[in-house]
């Protein structure tokens, strides 16, 4: 709303959203959000402003994408859990930045976290549900093992249970510490 009202040379979703326009919007939103959170990528407000899916390949490679239509009717679901806890971004970013000082953490980030995240995105965009659930399980385990301080304590056993019984897999939204947790279930009724 602030950008919509005050921006000069406003870029709208109705335009041809070139890479350059997306990067400009990302830069503007990064500056705006950094005022509240310290350091921000600008991706969350960009996505909210556009209200369309964007694919982020790297800091400088973002583009508008489509989400495949779901033709199959089944028991699976993507869902959100409200942790009921208010999260403050700065402490979570500090935990992450401290972890980044460790070689093992950086290696895990590149060799596992980024790898499985990218595989999940590809599986989702290609509509490959079998592979999506396999890779989401791997990602969920990597997150639990390496980002545990960012997962609200009351969700630790629930997180592990989903991985152990292969019924649902959880992923942090944003910086973690509270707020929402994204879930993927092969059979939503069983996951409940």
Spell out what each predicted region is.
Residues 7-13, 19, 23, 27-39, ...:
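C-terminal nucleotide
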């Amino acid at each position: 709303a602030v950008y919509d009202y005050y921006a000069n040379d406003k870029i709208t979703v109705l335009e041809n959203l070139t890479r350059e326009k997306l990067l400009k919007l990302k830069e503007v939103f990064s500056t705006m959000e950094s005022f509240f959170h310290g350091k921000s990528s600008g991706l969350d407000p960009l996505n909210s402003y556009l209200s369309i899916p964007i694919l982020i390949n790297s800091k400088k490679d973002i583009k508008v994408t489509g989400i495949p239509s779901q033709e199959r009717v089944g028991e699976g679901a993507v869902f959100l859990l409200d942790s009921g806890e208010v999260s403050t971004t700065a402490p979570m970013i500090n935990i992450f930045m401290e972890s980044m000082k460790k070689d093992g953490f950086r290696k895990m980030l590149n060799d596992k976290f980024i790898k499985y995240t990218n595989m999940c995105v590809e599986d989702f965009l290609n509509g490959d549900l079998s592979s999506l659930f396999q890779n989401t399980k791997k990602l969920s385990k990597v997150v639990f093992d390496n980002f545990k301080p960012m997962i609200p304590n009351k969700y630790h056993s629930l997180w592990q249970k989903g991985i152990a019984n292969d019924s649902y897999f959880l992923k942090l939204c944003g910086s973690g510490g509270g707020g929402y947790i994204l879930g993927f279930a092969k059979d939503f009724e069983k996951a409940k």
